[in-house]
Amino acid sequence: MVKYCIYTENVNRDLIESILNENLESFSIQDQIGVWKGTKEKSLKIEVLGTYQDDHIKYVAGLIKVLNNQQAVLVTCERLENNWLI
């Protein structure tokens, strides 16, 4: 299993959620404060657990980047060794 995190500015949240619902089976969203080039901004951390292909997550992040007219959206990927769904 893989944990992906997408970090983006907290604007167009309803449209971001629509993109996520259309492209992912499940996800969670956390409100955060981020800093980009010295400027503090409200941001979102989108966490996705699953067996998605990396390119699919990059595609989703790209849709969010275009929607929010951002220079960059950070995506992290962590391979999980042990996990349980109880």
Language model: regions and residue ranges:
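Positively charged, small/polar-rich N-terminal and surface patches that mediate targeting and assembly
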Residues: 1-86
